Amino acid sequence: FLLSFDGGPSIVPGNTEALATFLRKQKQAALFFVLGQNLQTRRDKQSMQALRDLYRGQCVGTQGWQYRSHAQWKDWEDSVIRGVARAQSDLPEQYVPLFRPPYGQRRADSPAFFASQNLRVTLWDIDAQDLGPLTAEQSAQRTLTLMLLWRRGLIQLNDSQPKALEVVTWLLTNTAQSGIGWEDCRDFAGQ
């Protein structure tokens, strides 16, 4: 299984720091899908080195410049290009050429564009549903149940949600002696 986080980075200081620090302590390398505008906001408020240290040991893909459905949006390609450029420029060591479309929605004519940009569209298999009304423990139990059913997959959590850290902590604690394996994001990304 691989942990992935959407919609970051959070505001300074925020959930992103807590998640990334916890993952490093657990020797886990997760996949963070960032928004270009959020990365720009971070860049404006902290040093470039602090931003790079934030994602040290993790992988960073993109969700474009802003979190907006691509299904009906004319400027979606520009959003992707700008988001990739910001992530590559700011986080060259952590950047991986993976793109997660906001809401999982993309246009039928998008595959050629993504191929031309050398981006692999990366969805998820298991949604922790940490944005909804579930408690952190309910979200974690739901995730574990789906993990046991699917036996492998990409788990989606939301970077900006305080519940995400609680869910990850619960999952790692409750699977520690189970034999469940956690994939390194660099292996997944082919890096």
Regions found by a protein language model. Name each.
Residues P9, G36-N38, Q66-R68, Y103-Q105, ...:
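Active-site-proximal loop/turn and secondary-structure-junction residues that shape catalytic pockets
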Residues S10-E17, K74-D78, G104, L134, ...:
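Soluble non-cytosolic domains of exported or imported proteins
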Residues Q105-L148, I180-Q191:
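His/Asp/Glu-enriched short active-site or ligand-binding loop at hydrolase and phosphoryl-transfer sites
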